[in-house]
Amino acid sequence: MSFLIVANWKMNGTRSSFVDFIGKLNNKSNEITSKLVICPPFTSFQSNIELNNNIKIGGQNCHHKEFGSYTGEISAGMLKELGCSYVILGHSERAHETDSEIKLKSETAIESGLHPIICVGENSEDYKNKKTKEVIEYQCKNRLPTQGKYTIAYEPIWAIGTGNVPNNDAIAEVIKSCTGKKHIIYGGSVSSENIENLLSIPNLSGVLIGSASLDFDHFYKIIQQVEKKFSLN
């Protein structure tokens, strides 16, 4: 599997900025071997947008039901119809979601032909109390689907948007505790300044990038460092 680079735009960007961003990526695609997934707001989706083979579109959430009276929600099937291949699930910024709801969403996503990226991560209190492994193992047990292809995104809640990142040994320990649980990527304050260090972590399958993915030049610097790393291997 190619190294996975996921851009989570959250509630940022417009349709025109998304089209411009994708156009720039398409122009650079012959220099990129990594798999790129861009997750803009729903309003930016265009089902007819031209994408080169290594660029995919993802959603930032989906409901576990196919349709119904769920104001403000979107189904996995709707995302698929809009041209999505991936969907981020269980992000900590989505308040009050239970582990069982996240599991249902992941199973529905797979049934609809999407590849779920399922977030796990400890809060600052659990981190300080050295309960990271315990929390991650519990979340994996209760959030992950029983079958199908998926990716785990280890994104410690205390690291999101703070500029703080766990040391490589701590991330490697989480990956080790998830052995046999498919592919594992890291998210939480990923930037062009720390990506080189993160790339030295054994068995890391990719990265989930937030604010650093909004600026094309910054995002492309990250891609270039990933490409440099794997071209030397």
UniProtKB/Swiss-Prot annotation:
SUPFAM superfamilies: Triosephosphate isomerase (TIM) (SSF51351). PROSITE patterns: TIM_1 (PS00171), TIM_2 (PS51440). InterPro entries: Aldolase_TIM, TIM_sf, TrioseP_Isoase_bac/euk, Triosephosphate_isomerase, Triosephosphate_isomerase_AS. Pathway: Carbohydrate biosynthesis; gluconeogenesis; Carbohydrate degradation; glycolysis; D-glyceraldehyde 3-phosphate from glycerone phosphate: step 1/1. It is found in: Cytoplasm. It catalyses: D-glyceraldehyde 3-phosphate = dihydroxyacetone phosphate. GO terms for molecular function: triose-phosphate isomerase activity. Coiled coil: none annotated. Its EC number is 5.3.1.1. Transmembrane segments: none annotated. Substrate binds at N8, W9, K10, G161, S189. It is an enzyme of class 5 (isomerase). Keywords: Cytoplasm, Gluconeogenesis, Glycolysis, Isomerase. Its main location: cytoplasm. Homodimer. Belongs to the triosephosphate isomerase family. Involved in the gluconeogenesis. Catalyzes stereospecifically the conversion of dihydroxyacetone phosphate (DHAP) to D-glyceraldehyde-3-phosphate (G3P). This is Triosephosphate isomerase. It comes from Wolbachia pipientis subsp. Culex pipiens (strain wPip). The gene is tpiA.
